[in-house]
């Protein structure tokens, strides 16, 4: 069973990701991880922190000479600002006089609407929001991206699967309604200021961000992850928690600020009749073919061989520059919410994080289906399964050949 966990605080010494259950033989380097972390920093509308934040990556265990060993993989991501926060975020007790002189240690008692501050303070008995916001911060997603790089490399090397994403809309901008991009389009997408796949939509998104920045406000949006090359049969229909769509939705909803997930055409299918909501099947030279992908590559909780499409809705960042009304929990008085340095819009970066969680879930599903202790063994198991699937679809291909369909 593939498992992953992260540790660390936003202004702590470092973030740590641990991946357990990955097979031996997967090629991965600290450079590959750093490249994915750099993609996470992309996007128009990011805050000042992105200008100096550099994700120094150290692989602590589980990889030797660029190849996984089969044991737990631990990855550390340094915090370049740690010297400024060393006393405030120290693990061991610090002299009270030293903390009193630090503006960074000022009590944060005015929780931000939409953030974890309020519920976290009450749940854990904190008098200060600092312990909450440090762990709840989206900075934690850097550790997830590091873990997801391992999964991404496994999917590519074992199954030939590629995971990418693009931004559908930002705020009230124009919405991208064209066909999903292919793996050859990723360079173009990452070169876009907002990771958009359409120049006109990109201009509309940038205008939205500029307007929000001028007004001292923040923006959310919608991103789509696309996965290419998946085999039929990952996931299961046998129980709810084995359904791949339930696992994907849970993983993506676990990303900070994500408030909605849909697979394929999702909510749009609720407005259609059944005759226009599903993907009809036809005979093709290689087996069953389809002309549409409304289901987004999943049927009955299982992959069906078509591209997987997962969309996520990100709410506007809750640290609003012009600040929202709140209550000071120390005095009970009405107040203005605390304001930490933040982005106007982090939707482009959210797409990379959605890719990460989708890759982790799919890698877990693939390992559950095909198993193996090494990359080579997983490949052999996959090849045997694919031969069995081809045999099962042979009558379809034979009929297609005899009838001249798809020629």
Swiss-Prot record:
Broad enzyme group: lyase
Give the UniProt record's GO annotations in the biological process aspect.
amino acid biosynthetic process; aromatic amino acid family biosynthetic process; chorismate biosynthetic process
Which family is annotated?
Belongs to the chorismate synthase family.
Protein EC: 4.2.3.5
Report if keyword Cell cycle is assigned.
Answer: no
Q: Which cofactor does it need?
A: FMNH2
Q: Which Pfam families match?
A: Chorismate_synt
Task: Give me the reactions it catalyses.
Answer: 5-O-(1-carboxyvinyl)-3-phosphoshikimate = chorismate + phosphate
- Report whether Amino-acid biosynthesis shows up as a keyword of the record: yes
Q: What is the role of this chain?
A: This reaction introduces a second double bond into the aromatic ring system.
Task: Tell me the SUPFAM superfamilies matching this sequence.
Answer: Chorismate synthase, AroC
The record's GO molecular-function terms, alphabetically, read:
chorismate synthase activity; FMN binding
| GO CC annotation terms, alphabetical | cytosol
Residue pairs linked by disulfide bridges in the UniProt entry: none
Q: Which InterPro entries match?
A: Chorismate_synth, Chorismate_synth_AroC_sf, Chorismate_synthase_CS
Q: What does the record note about the cofactor? A: Reduced FMN (FMNH(2)).
Pathway connected to this protein: Metabolic intermediate biosynthesis; chorismate biosynthesis; chorismate from D-erythrose 4-phosphate and phosphoenolpyruvate: step 7/7
State whether it acts alone or in a complex, and with which partners, per the record. Homotetramer.
Q: What is this protein called?
A: Chorismate synthase
UniProt keyword list: Amino-acid biosynthesis, Aromatic amino acid biosynthesis, FAD, Flavoprotein, FMN, Lyase, NADP
